[in-house]
Amino acid sequence: MTPNPMTNDLPDPAAAPDSAPLYSPARVRALLAAHGLKPTKSLGQNFLIDGNILRAIAEAGGAAPGENVLEIGPGLGVLTREVASRGARVTALEKDERLRPVLAETLAGLDVNVIWGDALDFDYAALPAGTRVIANLPYYITGLLLTRFMQAPGVVSATVLVQKEVAQRLVAQPGQDNYGFLSAVAALYGSVKHVRDVPKGAFFPAPDVTSSVVRLDFDRTRPQPDPAFVSFVDNALRYRRKTLRNNLRMMGHSGEAIDAALSDLGLRPDVRAEDVPLSGLRAVAAALGVVR
């Protein structure tokens, strides 16, 4: 994806619309109507219009003046403005080219570089060290994007608005109802904190689900997780309510090898995959020769 700054699109800084924040459905409708636009459901365009929540997200993101921030899907630019106005250098990835004139208007005078294209095509590995992600993520690609953030060595944190169900999975611990692969892989890379829930009415148009803000902090002093172990965890937790033994059998391991590994590690033969902590899964993987 080639950077495409909006410098030539932006009006004079004095024209930045500070006096008319987009904090109501009426304001959003008026702005969209002025440009002949409507929200596109297929792109997950539910625009956040609650000023208190926007400020809370920016605050939780923790970007200091001069730090690099990456935003996915700036939409109308309201969160972008909140973060950039605090002195951060914001790069925003936007897929919907129809929003060019809108962002030219709402981001006037701010230190923001908009890159036009699909966020799934962006080279996250090239981000500078210390980059923080602060974004209202498109819900239909949340999992893919979270994985990209985790794997990008320059990204130190991601403060993101996601579906509440996804947030519950991210913060879940082994043995809890929502624990699964996403919970485990997030723990492999660092830690997750629930910031706050966000009601449907904070968006225009309102989504079908409740949302939550979470912050993921990535410990870049750790070595990158072994891909073989990540794949093992994925398969082990794919049917998390089944016994770990059954899941391992579906992975192609022999019953004898599995029984020996579980016995040696003090794990019950009927233990469920969701009840085994990462350290236990790593020990099982080592016993089965998946990792060293």
Swiss-Prot record:
GO BP: any one term: rRNA methylation
Key words of the record: Cytoplasm, Methyltransferase, RNA-binding, rRNA processing, S-adenosyl-L-methionine, Transferase
One of the record's GO molecular function terms: rRNA (adenine-N6,N6-)-dimethyltransferase activity
Keyword hit for S-adenosyl-L-methionine: yes
Catalytic activity: adenosine(1518)/adenosine(1519) in 16S rRNA + 4 S-adenosyl-L-methionine = N(6)-dimethyladenosine(1518)/N(6)-dimethyladenosine(1519) in 16S rRNA + 4 S-adenosyl-L-homocysteine + 4 H(+)
EC number annotated for this UniProt entry: 2.1.1.182
Gene Ontology CC annotation, any one: cytosol
Pfam families in alphabetical order: RrnaAD (PF00398)
The UniProt record lists the keyword Transferase: yes
InterPro entries in UniProt: KsgA/Erm, rRNA_Ade_diMease-like_C, rRNA_Ade_Mease_Trfase_CS, rRNA_Ade_methylase_Trfase_N, rRNA_adenine_dimethylase, SAM-dependent_MTases_sf
UniProt binding sites for S-adenosyl-L-methionine: N46, L48, G73, E94, D118, N136
Location in the cell: Cytoplasm
Leader sequence residues: none
Reported function: Specifically dimethylates two adjacent adenosines (A1518 and A1519) in the loop of a conserved hairpin near the 3'-end of 16S rRNA in the 30S particle. May play a critical role in biogenesis of 30S subunits.
Similarity comment: Belongs to the class I-like SAM-binding methyltransferase superfamily. rRNA adenine N(6)-methyltransferase family. RsmA subfamily.
Protein name, entry field: Ribosomal RNA small subunit methyltransferase A
Source lineage: Bacteria, Thermotogati, Deinococcota, Deinococci, Deinococcales
Gene: rsmA
